[in-house]
């Protein structure tokens, strides 16, 4: 018996049902890689951030997440180069979906019990996504804005429901506005830390502040 179509599991009807010691025998998720491109690029190298945002409360299968990841990555590598971007899938498929297998061969009525004991066996995993939740993010250089929009537009076709594409006002994957970011770094309010930044508050021990601004 083949895999049941994902449209059967599109809506969030049940409570979250993760893999645990009570829910065993769960198949591995199809998506294994969540960060692609130049992951170790410094925060100041890729100022532009683009996001695909869900417009529905639904479930996205791990197969769909993998298909969208491959689609967006292929376009970005072709248009911006292998080291010209950093892409991140922001959803993880933790919710387990079940299937109550029914036999359809001759004499099946003697073997199966119908809806008696209908709690099914694990079939796969999906990610539960809320309205306004980010599905995928890409950070790159400012001149690649149209390539980011096109990559996310192509990836949208792999998902059910509606999604929106946003070009962020923030700097890359950080939570600080792009127009204030460079000033804050110059004032040493922000310290670059990999693909993110550390915020240095204006209160605290004076010795630390003196060391930082010496």
Swiss-Prot record:
<dbReference type="GO" id="GO:0007141">
    <property type="term" value="P:male meiosis I"/>
</dbReference>
<dbReference type="GO" id="GO:0005829">
    <property type="term" value="C:cytosol"/>
</dbReference>
<dbReference type="GO" id="GO:0016020">
    <property type="term" value="C:membrane"/>
</dbReference>
<dbReference type="GO" id="GO:0022625">
    <property type="term" value="C:cytosolic large ribosomal subunit"/>
</dbReference>
<protein>
    <recommendedName>
        <fullName>Ribosomal protein uL16-like</fullName>
    </recommendedName>
</protein>
<dbReference type="GO" id="GO:0006412">
    <property type="term" value="P:translation"/>
</dbReference>
<dbReference type="InterPro" id="IPR036920">
    <property type="entry name" value="Ribosomal_uL16_sf"/>
</dbReference>
<comment type="subunit">
    <text>Component of a male germ cell-specific 60S large ribosomal subunit (LSU), which contains RPL10L and RPL39L, instead of RPL10 and RPL39 paralogs. The composition of the rest of the complex is similar to classical ribosomes.</text>
</comment>
<keyword id="KW-0469">Meiosis</keyword>
<keyword id="KW-0687">Ribonucleoprotein</keyword>
<keyword id="KW-0744">Spermatogenesis</keyword>
<dbReference type="Pfam" id="PF00252">
    <property type="entry name" value="Ribosomal_L16"/>
</dbReference>
<dbReference type="GO" id="GO:0007283">
    <property type="term" value="P:spermatogenesis"/>
</dbReference>
<keyword id="KW-0221">Differentiation</keyword>
<dbReference type="InterPro" id="IPR016180">
    <property type="entry name" value="Ribosomal_uL16_dom"/>
</dbReference>
<dbReference type="GO" id="GO:0005783">
    <property type="term" value="C:endoplasmic reticulum"/>
</dbReference>
<dbReference type="GO" id="GO:0000027">
    <property type="term" value="P:ribosomal large subunit assembly"/>
</dbReference>
<dbReference type="GO" id="GO:0030154">
    <property type="term" value="P:cell differentiation"/>
</dbReference>
<keyword id="KW-0689">Ribosomal protein</keyword>
<dbReference type="InterPro" id="IPR047873">
    <property type="entry name" value="Ribosomal_uL16"/>
</dbReference>
<dbReference type="GO" id="GO:0003735">
    <property type="term" value="F:structural constituent of ribosome"/>
</dbReference>
<keyword id="KW-0225">Disease variant</keyword>
<keyword id="KW-0963">Cytoplasm</keyword>
<comment type="function">
    <text>Testis-specific component of the ribosome, which is required for the transition from prophase to metaphase in male meiosis I. Compensates for the inactivated X-linked RPL10 paralog during spermatogenesis. The ribosome is a large ribonucleoprotein complex responsible for the synthesis of proteins in the cell. The male germ cell-specific ribosome displays a ribosomal polypeptide exit tunnel of distinct size and charge states compared with the classical ribosome.</text>
</comment>
<comment type="similarity">
    <text>Belongs to the universal ribosomal protein uL16 family.</text>
</comment>
<dbReference type="InterPro" id="IPR001197">
    <property type="entry name" value="Ribosomal_uL16_euk_arch"/>
</dbReference>
<dbReference type="InterPro" id="IPR018255">
    <property type="entry name" value="Ribosomal_uL16_CS_euk_arc"/>
</dbReference>
<dbReference type="GO" id="GO:0005840">
    <property type="term" value="C:ribosome"/>
</dbReference>
<dbReference type="GO" id="GO:0005634">
    <property type="term" value="C:nucleus"/>
</dbReference>
